[in-house]
């Protein structure tokens, strides 16, 4: 695992969290209960404190960083999509940040909000509860619908369930040379489907 102390500060990871072995956690990082940290995520707490609250997920290739005397926070059940960058910002409870989005210093994403994939949220942005944000720079285009929030909850639950599945069934191995006959397919734990 990539855990590094920095100036006597050691990352704190709740025993029920899952941190992929290729992820890197440096210094002042606090990871809560049931959190999922994906492959190649970088949580660099060498300036400001990084807090990932209970039930949140930080997916593959995400970056968290911030400035001194500030906290970068992902609230409870927050959902941070692949490749997103969070820098000195606050992501509200139950919010989703889409793939490859960038959230800058001092920005606050409101509870139950969704930031569309590939969006750029400017420094100092102050969002409200349940906004759909999109664009570069991102702006609020409408409220998040009940169906969208339900879809978000199902996706977040898949990652919360993945924590336990990874603790039990994920291990390093060697690849097969060819696909076996009748190879099974993996199943999720909810009926969530891709958004179209």
UniProtKB/Swiss-Prot annotation:
Q: Which GO terms describe its molecular function?
A: transferase activity
Q: Which domain of life is it from?
A: Bacteria
| Listed GO biological process terms | carnitine metabolic process
State a single Pfam family of this protein.
Answer: Hexapep
> Is this entry keyworded Repeat?
yes
Specify where the region named Disordered lies, as residue ranges. 176-196
Name of the protein in its database record = Carnitine operon protein CaiE
Q: Print the organism lineage.
A: Bacteria, Pseudomonadati, Pseudomonadota, Gammaproteobacteria, Enterobacterales
**Which gene codes for it?**
caiE
